[in-house]
């Protein structure tokens, strides 16, 4: 599963996910892309589940790029622990997703195969997404 190798600090503040994606919002590597329309968080498990769904559908053909990385730790306190006594331990990592962010890209497959693979992947994600075809000159 995806997670950072090292972090300067183990825990991070919650923060707010605002605005639109200004970087990583175009198809850069492949021919087709899956773009986030909504905003939210994707856990490392969700990113991996979507990748597996796509990989299984396209079988041996094509190449997939994951354009997001879960680098924000989310901490949780154990069950039935009283409030106070500090912040909980990091349990998992998430990627903060803004509208317009390119999530996955694909190349080396037909458009209908890519469309179906992205549809299967989108079913694993808690965000609204759109299928994007690379524009000429972009």
Curated annotation (Swiss-Prot):
- Does the keyword field hold Ribosomal protein? yes
Please, which domain of life does this record's source organism belong to? Bacteria
Against Gene3D superfamilies, the record matches this protein to: Ribosomal protein L10e/L16
Q: Which UniProt keywords apply?
A: Ribonucleoprotein, Ribosomal protein, RNA-binding, rRNA-binding, tRNA-binding
Task: Spell out the molecular function terms from Gene Ontology.
Answer: rRNA binding; structural constituent of ribosome; tRNA binding
Its Gene Ontology cellular component terms are: cytosolic large ribosomal subunit
Q: Where is the composition biased (Basic residues)?
A: 1-13
GO terms classed as biological process: translation
Q: Which PROSITE patterns match?
A: RIBOSOMAL_L16_1
Q: What's a Pfam family this protein contains?
A: Ribosomal_L16
Q: Where is this region: Disordered?
A: 1-24
- Cited InterPro entries: Ribosomal_uL16, Ribosomal_uL16_bact-type, Ribosomal_uL16_CS, Ribosomal_uL16_dom, Ribosomal_uL16_sf
The task this protein performs is described as: Binds 23S rRNA and is also seen to make contacts with the A and possibly P site tRNAs.
Give the record's family classification.
Belongs to the universal ribosomal protein uL16 family.
On subunit structure and binding partners, the annotation says:
Part of the 50S ribosomal subunit.
What is the name listed in the Swiss-Prot or TrEMBL entry for this protein? Large ribosomal subunit protein uL16
Which organism is this protein's natural source? Answer: Burkholderia cenocepacia (strain HI2424)
Gene name tied to this protein: rplP
């Amino acid at each position: 599963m995806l997670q950072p190798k090292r972090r300067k600090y183990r825990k991070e503040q919650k923060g707010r996910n605002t605005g639109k994606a200004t970087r990583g919002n175009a198809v850069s590597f492949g021919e087709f892309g899956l773009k986030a329309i909504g905003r939210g968080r994707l856990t490392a498990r969700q990113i991996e589940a979507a990748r597996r769904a796509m990989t299984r559908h396209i079988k041996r053909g094509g190449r997939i790029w994951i354009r997001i990385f879960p680098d924000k730790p989310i901490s949780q306190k154990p069950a039935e622990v009283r409030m106070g006594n500090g912040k909980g331990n990091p349990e998992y990592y998430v990627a903060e997703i803004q509208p317009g962010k390119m999530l996955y890209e694909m190349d080396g497959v037909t458009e209908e195969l890519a469309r179906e693979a992205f549809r299967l992947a989108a079913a694993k994600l808690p965000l609204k997404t759109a299928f994007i075809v690379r524009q000429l000159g972009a």
